[in-house]
């Protein structure tokens, strides 16, 4: 009898251990988020929610009627259409853009987002789709600023985010008199026009568009970029399925000429990376 009870206890112990191990395995799988249905969630919702700074022309900004337009917006609309959903555009506070993405307030960050190491630690990126440089903009009459080295002792303006990070990592930041940070580039340009700062550090695509459209007496300091950058689309690290599909569609758009057409519309040339 004792032998039977002992055998029963052993079998019961093994059975219970197996159940516990199985439960741990299931829990780990769920908490790790290995079942990625991010693309299907977008399809079920019927929309792709894009987060942006709606002052970042020409990537995503408000036109005279208040509608949000831009190069990235046109790309995203086409991608959403090919997925089979609508595009919802959601302006966000760019200084907390990654938080908005990871909280689930938006599905993608798509607004001239610079790919850098600090962001890659928090989110995933699509393939780079655009090359960009961080450049210096000055008033046309400032003959004392002709190179990066001339920024020593000057008051500089920069938007909070990747541009701010890039400037801070450059040795010239330690030689500047002051670095003023702005939520949006437009406010930096307003201070430049009012001579409250000496130069603005900004993405080249945004600078060239602003100077052309606003007809301001600003110029780009030639042959003196602070960095070479790449733009990508930001995704939550769990949303690999959605990222893969967006990359596939963007490759498809490059191959069929759609990306080139959109680029011609906004930049008068095809600048999309092949």
Predicted features and spans:
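Short, low-complexity disordered leader/linker segments with a strong preference
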Residues: 1-45, 272-274
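Extracytoplasmic small-molecule ligand-binding "clamshell" domains
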Residues: 33-111
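Flexible hinge/capping segments at coil-to-helix
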Residues: 41, 126, 139-156
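Short loop->beta-strand "edge-of-pocket" segments that line small-molecule binding or catalytic clefts
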Residues: 46-52, 148-164
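Periplasmic-binding protein-like
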Residues: 54, 131-138, 186, 208-251, ...
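Ligand-binding cleft/hinge of the Venus flytrap
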Residues: 76-85, 164-182, 211-215
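Short helix-initiation/N-cap motifs at beta->coil->alpha
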Residues: 88-99, 143, 180-194
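A ligand-binding cleft/hinge motif common to bilobed small-molecule-binding domains
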Residues: 96, 113-121, 169-170, 191-194, ...
């Amino acid at each position: 009898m004792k032998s039977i009870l002992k055998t029963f206890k052993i079998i019961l112990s093994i059975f219970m251990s197996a159940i516990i191990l199985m439960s741990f395995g299931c829990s780990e799988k769920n908490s790790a988020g290995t079942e990625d249905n991010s693309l299907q969630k977008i399809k079920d919702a019927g929309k792709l929610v894009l987060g942006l700074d709606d002052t970042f022309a020409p990537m995503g900004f408000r036109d005279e009627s208040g509608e949000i337009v831009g190069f990235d917006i046109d790309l995203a609309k086409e991608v959403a259409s090919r997925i089979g959903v609508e595009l919802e555009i959601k302006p966000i506070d760019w200084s907390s853009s990654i938080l908005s993405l990871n909280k689930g307030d938006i599905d993608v960050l798509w607004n001239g987002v610079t790919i850098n190491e600090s962001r890659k630690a928090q989110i995933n990126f699509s393939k780079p789709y655009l090359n960009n440089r961080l450049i210096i903009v000055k008033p046309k009459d400032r003959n004392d600023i002709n190179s990066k080295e001339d920024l020593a002792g000057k008051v500089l303006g920069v938007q909070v985010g990747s541009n701010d990070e890039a400037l801070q990592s450059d040795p010239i930041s330690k030689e500047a008199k002051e670095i003023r940070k702005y939520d949006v580039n437009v406010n930096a340009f307003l201070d430049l026009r009012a001579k409250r700062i000496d130069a603005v550090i900004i993405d080249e695509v945004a600078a060239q568009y602003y100077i052309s459209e606003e007809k301001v007496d600003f110029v780009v300091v030639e042959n003196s970029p602070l960095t070479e950058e790449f733009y990508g689309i930001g995704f939550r690290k769990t949303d690999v399925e959605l990222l893969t599909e967006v990359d596939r569609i963007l490759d498809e758009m490059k191959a069929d000429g759609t990306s080139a057409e959109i680029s011609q519309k906004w930049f008068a040339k095809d600048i999309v990376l092949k």
